[in-house]
């Protein structure tokens, strides 16, 4: 018998594209943006099952297929190719069957149907993450067909509900809670939902915040009688940012992990109730996010941001003003401008274990197949994987779509990249036999 890599061979490109065409055809129905758009991952899962069920134990094949749903139409699939040694295992997880939304009017092609332009495979989900669903399905199909004798059990976990966290208990969080992934802790877990063919070794945490500013509305010809909420908001945001960067500077470990940026705190949205050009606004809301490298604690940052706001409120007269009649206190009216801060659900970043066997085999496989290895880190966030890490899983992350098209209009991936991803997977399986 040849080597594992010889047996598993190359990606069957025709079969991959055929399956991808079917799952991209469902992408309109797996957009995830509740309450308007609740994905029906069952539609994608059915196409995966159509490929793998003939090779399952119920049909006399080697694959153990477990279809798990915690809500109607919200499917997860756990597919297992058993090895010969108890406790020896590796897994490919995170291939999610939902997608972010797409507006066909903004695209150069139909986002909800696969179109092929040479090496380019175009459509919503090609990079994130239906392309990976189809890719890992082909890997498990090849294992089921060729039946190599492996020491390690190989498990693939296709999940629901990755793109939105407003509805919980549907996807990988529920699988972990119910113990269905416990045995995956005995070996490396490869989360297949990043891009650019290199190991992603660090991701950022995210804290969405809103600062509501209250001043006093008045005629713009009498600015001394107003508290300008816009000016107060600008100066307060600047002060909060200055304090944040003092307390959470670039961390020494960020260089080791290759983070492109340190932690950041910035506004991204601004709103106010409206009014005439001759009215000084009495309130406004500034919203934004903190992107936090994984070497800082999310709860520590939230506590600090609240402290900044409390201190600014207590000392609001010390805040910089804008011009001779700009002020944030009206003593004669016993009025003070004020701020309040609130947070939406925060997520923590991840720093992968660079000493683990999983990381080393991923790097070696990448170098062999792609020709070089250059791990990277971003302060973009990958939900769910920090929780897996805290539960005791050795999580490593990789992906074979394109970062440039991630969540973007005119999303596409390259067939040649996906074919290399398949070879990386077979190299990982082969190395872990030693």
Which residue stretches match the model-derived regions?
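Active-site metal-coordination/substrate-binding segment of hydrolases
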Residues: 87-158
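Short beta-strand segments
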Residues: 94-96, 157-159, 190-193, 212-214, ...
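Acidic/histidine-rich catalytic neighborhood of metal-dependent amide-processing enzymes
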Residues: 129-203
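Metal-dependent amide/peptide-bond hydrolase catalytic core
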Residues: 1-4, 8-11, 42-43, 194, ...
């Amino acid at each position: 018998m040849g080597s594992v890599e010889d047996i598993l061979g190359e990606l069957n490109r025709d079969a991959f594209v055929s399956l991808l065409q079917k799952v991209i055809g469902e992408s309109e129905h797996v957009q995830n943006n509740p309450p308007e758009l609740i994905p029906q991952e069952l539609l994608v899962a059915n196409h995966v099952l159509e490929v793998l069920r003939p090779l399952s134990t119920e049909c006399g094949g080697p694959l153990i297929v477990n279809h798990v749903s915690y809500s109607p139409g919200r499917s997860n699939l756990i597919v297992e190719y058993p090895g010969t040694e108890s406790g020896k295992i590796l897994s490919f997880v995170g291939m999610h069957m939902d997608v972010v939304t797409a507006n066909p009017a903004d695209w150069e092609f139909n986002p909800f149907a696969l179109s092929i332009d040479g090496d380019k495979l175009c459509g919503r989900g090609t990079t994130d993450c239906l392309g990976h669903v189809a890719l890992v399905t082909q890997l498990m199909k090849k294992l089921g067909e060729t039946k190599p004798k492996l020491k390690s059990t190989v498990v693939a976990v296709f999940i629901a509900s990755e793109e939105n966290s407003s509805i919980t208990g549907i996807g990988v969080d529920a699988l972990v809670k119910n113990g269905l992934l416990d045995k995956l802790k005995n070996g490396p877990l490869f989360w297949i939902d990043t891009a650019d063919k290199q190991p992603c070794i660090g991701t950022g945490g995210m804290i969405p915040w809103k600062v509501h500013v209250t001043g006093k509305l008045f005629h713009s010809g009498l600015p001394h009688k107003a508290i300008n909420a816009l000016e107060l908001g600008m100066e307060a945001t600047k002060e909060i940012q200055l304090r944040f960067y003092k307390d959470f500077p670039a961390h020494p470990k960020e260089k080791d992990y290759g983070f492109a940026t340190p932690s950041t705190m910035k506004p991204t949205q601004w709103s106010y109730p409206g009014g005439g050009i001759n009215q000084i606004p009495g309130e406004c809301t500034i919203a934004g996010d903190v992107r936090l490298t994984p070497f800082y604690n999310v709860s520590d940052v939230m506590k600090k941001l609240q402290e900044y706001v409390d201190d600014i409120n207590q000392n609001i007269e010390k805040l910089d003003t804008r011009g001779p009649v700009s002020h944030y206190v009206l003593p004669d009216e016993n009025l003070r401008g004020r701020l309040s801060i609130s947070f939406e659900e925060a997520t923590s970043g991840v720093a992968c274990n660079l000493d683990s066997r999983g990381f080393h085999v991923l790097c070696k496989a990448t170098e062999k197949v792609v020709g070089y290895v250059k791990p990277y880190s971003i302060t973009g966030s990958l939900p769910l994987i920090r929780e897996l890490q805290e539960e005791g899983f050795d999580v490593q992350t990789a992906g074979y779509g394109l970062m440039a098209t991630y969540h973007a209009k005119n999303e596409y991936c390259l067939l040649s990249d996906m074919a290399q991803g398949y070879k990386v997977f077979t190299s990982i399986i082969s190395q872990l036999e030693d």
